A protein has these predicted regions:
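Bacterial N-terminal signal peptides that target proteins for export
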Residues: 1-9
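N-terminal signal peptide c-region/cleavage motif recognized by signal peptidases
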Residues: 15-17
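An N-terminal assembly and electron-transfer interface module characteristic of large anaerobic redox
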Residues: 23-558
């Protein structure tokens, strides 16, 4: 309990003399999906940092690759006078994006030369930290119409290869022969060549770390499971990391889509020499040892990876901490979940700094509706540091944690308090609409429409059929955005520095499908405010509103 009091007391003591000078982070994202770049931009905005991306036309779209040559030229020609860090997706630079990294269209020599050019740029700017992230190739090929007849058989075949490698059980050998008969030999050869090329490039990347061309690298395990060809790949990478002596600068984490967020957090925390301490509360302790869908490590190990890679560190008991992460694990037992929910609600109501990561995800990647309802009640949504619940456990934790880290950092370093508080609320609203409403309600409706059209498929849809789906998504999701905003945010008041503001409007709304499928959505907007009142002079030093004077609380804003 004493440690919790210290946490609250620390909030009351935060006071800034001036706002930080605006800085930039240059980010080469994984691809053009919002999760690859827009989420990181929203997080950076909390700290008044502009996360700058290459022109979107260079980033590709689904199976149309990005343009690495143009992107490298963009990176070369940027003005580095205000650049705090550079974050590079090696899959975009080397191959043209995540989807293109899963096929063998780019030779190793071309990919390695492109990485070498990035190394030359780093040498021209030795004062700027360079971070990189690279996908350890997932088991299954990208879902397209062209591979619909054999991709599942191929992924099951290579999974069984690893099971057989470890156990030598004869039944696996027979199943492998049956599956192999259903996979075109040319496609299996392409798949194996692609894996070998990607692995060779990652060995090259480790040497670049050894040569100080990158300060820190995340090797992100794309959608996986406990068995598969990625396991021996990881084992070989770990051996090479140890041989090169770069273990402190290379981290292997679950997931890939979230690592722009993770590295934005790490870059900012390292720039300001701060490591937040994160107390973790699980909805069911037994869930710590479960392996979440699409991951190869148990939840606790995956969580530690995301925390450490982001620049934070976990506190698993009630020691001193900067915020609490409430983690809803897969399939928690009902009595334990109810207790978890009660503590979460109490902490939010008391104003403690709270982040929520919901990894109790349904098969379609949607969060727990019971948790959503608890956060909906009593306007609890906008009283948190962050929330996420989308796609995979790694994606979720690697979104909620960086946002909480960066918001707290922004309070410490002295940035524009109104921008910080607005960016936080925009991020929270975005998460609930994007993560929960879209995948729970709008996306199923889009799939129903797709299934009703003979010239459309869930893998990819084009032309007039795509326009119909896109229009449905725009109209339907706009309704949820409007409702969530009106019922949770409109008219709510908050403090930014010594000024109180009221949320008045939702502006610049943009909703569209970024790729020719309904799997994800691009959602953009800005929240408008008006000034309500200033604090009384006696309370200006602490930044505590008159109603909270004498009480150390989370809600006041320095």
């Amino acid at each position: 309990m004493l440690s919790r009091v210290r946490v609250l007391a620390a909030w009351a003591l935060v006071c800034v003399a001036s706002w930080a000078v605006a800085e930039r982070i240059l980010l080469i994202p994984l691809d053009s999906r919002p999760a690859a770049g827009h989420f990181a931009q929203m997080i950076g905005r909390m700290a008044s940092v502009e996360v700058t991306l290459p022109p979107i036309e260079h980033l590709g779209r689904f199976t149309d690759p990005g343009n690495p040559e143009r992107i490298i030229e963009w990176l070369r020609d940027e003005d580095y006078s205000d650049v705090l860090a550079v974050i590079v997706s090696t899959d975009m630079v080397a191959f043209g994006g995540l989807i293109e990294s899963r096929v063998d269209s780019v030779p190793y020599e071309t990919a390695a030369y492109r990485m070498k050019r990035v190394g030359f740029i780093r040498q021209r700017h030795p004062q700027v930290p360079f971070y990189a992230f690279s996908a350890i190739m997932r088991i299954q090929p990208t879902a397209t119409l062209a591979n619909a007849s054999w991709r599942m058989q191929l992924s099951k075949y290579v999974e069984l290869q690893d099971r057989y490698r470890r156990t030598q059980r004869s039944e696996y050998a027979q199943s492998m022969r049956n599956l192999l008969a259903r996979v075109p030999p040319v496609e299996l050869n392409r798949y194996e060549r692609t894996r070998a090329r990607n692995h060779s490039l990652q060995l090259h990347l480790l040497q670049m770390v050894k040569d100080s061309l990158f300060d820190y690298v995340i090797l992100g395990q794309d959608d996986a499971q406990p068995y598969g060809p990625h396991i021996p790949d990881q084992e070989a990478l770990r051996r090479r990391i140890a041989q090169l002596g770069v273990a402190s600068r290379v981290y292997i984490c679950e997931g890939i889509d979230q690592h722009s967020n993770v590295l934005v957090s790490r870059a900012l925390l390292r720039a300001h020499d701060w490591m937040p301490r994160v107390r973790v509360a699980f909805s069911d302790d037994a869930g710590r040892r479960k392996i979440a869908s699409y991951e190869s490590k148990n939840v606790e190990l995956s969580l530690q990876d995301q925390l450490l890679a982001s620049g934070a560190r976990p506190v698993f008991r009630d020691g001193d901490h900067d915020y609490s992460l409430f983690l809803n694990v897969p399939d928690p037992r009902d009595p334990l979940f109810e207790g978890f929910l009660q503590v979460l609600i109490q902490d939010i109501e008391q104003g403690f700094p709270i982040a929520v990561a919901d990894i109790n995800l349904a098969k379609n990647g949607t969060g727990d509706p019971r948790l959503f309802q608890a956060l909906w009640e009593n306007h609890r949504m906008q009283r948190m540091l962050s929330y996420a619940g989308w796609n995979t456990a790694g994606n979720t934790m690697g979104t909620a944690i960086p946002a909480a880290n960066v918001y707290l950092l922004a309070r410490k370093i002295g940035v524009d308090p109104l921008q910080r508080e607005l960016a936080l609320r925009e991020f929270i609203l975005h998460r609930f609409v994007n993560d929960f409403a879209y995948h729970s309600f709008t996306r199923p409706k889009a799939y129903e429409l797709i299934d009703s059209m003979s010239r459309a498929s869930r893998e990819e849809t084009y032309g007039a059929e795509f326009e119909r789906v896109n229009t449905l998504v725009q109209v339907d999701l706009a309704g949820y955005l409007d409702r969530y905003f009106r019922e949770q945010f409109l008219g709510q008041k908050f403090f930014a520095g010594t000024e109180q503001y009221e949320i008045t409007s939702l502006n610049d709304v943009r909703i569209e499908l970024p790729w020719p499928r309904a799997y994800e959505v691009r959602l953009q907007f800005r929240i408008g405010t008006s000034s309500v009142s200033q604090l009384e002079p006696a309370n200006r030093a602490s930044g505590i509103p008159p109603s909270q004077s004498g009480r150390a609380r989370y809600l006041p804003s320095p």
